[in-house]
């Protein structure tokens, strides 16, 4: 059974495009919360299951921690663009963007990483919405987009159809997709659409599917 997606209800501000992007990020990686915070520590928007006030406080505190880290004189720390902090009860990821903006993500329990595909998609969409340049360190993940896939009735890890241009598009499996970016528990395929386009599909550990350079999204 597919997990129920989070919603934008129970908020203390009107939903924005930023909130929708962060909501999808939370759903993609199972995160309890995610927030976009500006250089002054103000939360632009957020998503998650926590109280909005708690999300705002956490976002401001971690944005300050990221700023302090980037201001220190230790070699390699001042240009940190991605920081993971693991605590006894909660863990967080801090993602630096242009002009002092940052994404603060509370990680799923016992996790110390986040899907680079989900993160790359969120960064791309947030930067487009905010008029920011995508950081160079995330350009390599710019081609991945989360998609809906109908799995084979014989094997849920094998794709049968892709939701494409308003309908289910049958897929022709050409072979396995193998690359260093595949993590433990992930499986990839090279597929052909009925349009003749060939794309890479990856199923991540949480059952989310991602397509690389899908024509309708590029």
Model regions: which residues?
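Cysteine-centric segments in proteins
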Residues: 136-218
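Acidic surface patches and DE-rich sequence motifs
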Residues: 38, 87, 97, 193-195, ...
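Generic beta-strand hydrophobic packing signal
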Residues: 34-35, 83, 162, 176
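Generic low-polarity alpha-helical segments
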Residues: 34, 65, 166-170
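Acidic, low-complexity cytosolic segments
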Residues: 1-33, 40-138
């Amino acid at each position: 059974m597919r997990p129920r997606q989070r919603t934008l209800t129970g908020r203390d501000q009107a939903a924005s495009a930023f909130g929708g992007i962060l909501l999808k990020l939370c759903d993609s990686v199972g995160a309890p919360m995610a927030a976009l915070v500006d250089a002054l520590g103000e939360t632009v928007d957020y998503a998650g299951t926590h109280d909005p006030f708690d999300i705002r406080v956490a976002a401001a505190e971690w944005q300050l921690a990221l700023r302090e880290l980037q201001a220190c004189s230790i070699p390699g720390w001042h240009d940190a663009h991605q920081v993971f902090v693991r605590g006894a009860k909660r863990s967080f990821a801090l993602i630096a963007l242009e002009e002092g903006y940052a994404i603060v993500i509370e990680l799923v329990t016992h996790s110390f990483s986040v899907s680079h595909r989900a993160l790359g998609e969120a960064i791309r969409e947030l930067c487009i919405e905010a008029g920011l340049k995508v950081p160079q360190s995330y350009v390599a993940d710019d081609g991945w987009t989360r998609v809906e896939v109908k799995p084979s009735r014989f094997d849920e890890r094998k794709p049968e159809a892709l939701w494409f241009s308003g309908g289910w598009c049958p897929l022709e499996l050409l072979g396995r997709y193998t690359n260093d970016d595949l993590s433990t528990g992930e499986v990839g395929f090279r597929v052909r659409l009925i349009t003749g386009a060939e794309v890479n599909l990856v199923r991540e550990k949480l059952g989310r599917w991602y397509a690389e350079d899908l024509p309708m999204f590029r």
